[in-house]
Amino acid sequence: MSSITLALSKGRIFEETLPLLAAAGIVPADNPETSRKLIIDTNRPDVRLVIVRATDTPTYVQYGAADLGIAGKDVLLEHGGAGLYQPLDLDIAKCRLCVATRKGFDYAAASRPGGRVRVATKYINSAKTHFAAKGVHVDLIKLYGSMELAPLVGLADAIVDLVSSGSTLRANNLEEVEEIMPISSRLIVNQASLKLKRELIQPLLEAFAGAVK
């Protein structure tokens, strides 16, 4: 029997995906927040979930280890989207990709055309594209966490990171100075899977689309 595999990450994306799965008649057999299982069965024998790191979701789908996945726009921009069909913005896990600096830093002057800014981020591609469009020379420093520390210790002038409420920035005496883009999570589909398993995937796409409206 043909089956489909959906790649999800733990945390906010998984929790906000549950109502969409329910709309498609899919109920996970385990909760990844409390279970150590990385492959989770569902109430449907033809659907299973695999639990992966958020940044790995597009790779699993690109290479066909998963037929579908749910990933943030931020992750997809860094991945590049090769081999992926992105049929639907699910409007979940919403936040924004922003530039932030320590309070008092003259970002307006530093980011004028021809200026130079040292930026710490894990979103290298998005940051590079943003500053290139502004005509600003940018020295990018790749970090994987604790972005807020970089301006405080002189590692960088600014950071590019995801912001939701802004409370972490405020707690570290930083401020949001520019929004790069709004971020939400999208449904992604392996292009070959869509052709070979359309009879299974298409109803799922339609159920998700109906739930998002």
Swiss-Prot record:
**One record GO biological process:** L-histidine biosynthetic process
Q: Which reaction does it catalyse?
A: 1-(5-phospho-beta-D-ribosyl)-ATP + diphosphate = 5-phospho-alpha-D-ribose 1-diphosphate + ATP
Its pathway, per UniProt, is: Amino-acid biosynthesis; L-histidine biosynthesis; L-histidine from 5-phospho-alpha-D-ribose 1-diphosphate: step 1/9
Please tell me the species this chain comes from. Aromatoleum aromaticum (strain DSM 19018 / LMG 30748 / EbN1)
Protein name stated in the entry:
ATP phosphoribosyltransferase
Sequence similarity:
Belongs to the ATP phosphoribosyltransferase family. Short subfamily.
Q: What is its EC number?
A: 2.4.2.17
Q: Which gene encodes it?
A: hisG
Q: Output the lineage of the source organism.
A: Bacteria, Pseudomonadati, Pseudomonadota, Betaproteobacteria, Rhodocyclales
The record, for PANTHER family, names: ATP PHOSPHORIBOSYLTRANSFERASE, ATP PHOSPHORIBOSYLTRANSFERASE ATP-PRTASE
Q: Which GO terms describe its cellular component?
A: cytoplasm
The record's CDD domains line, in alphabetical order, gives: PBP2_HisGs (cd13595)
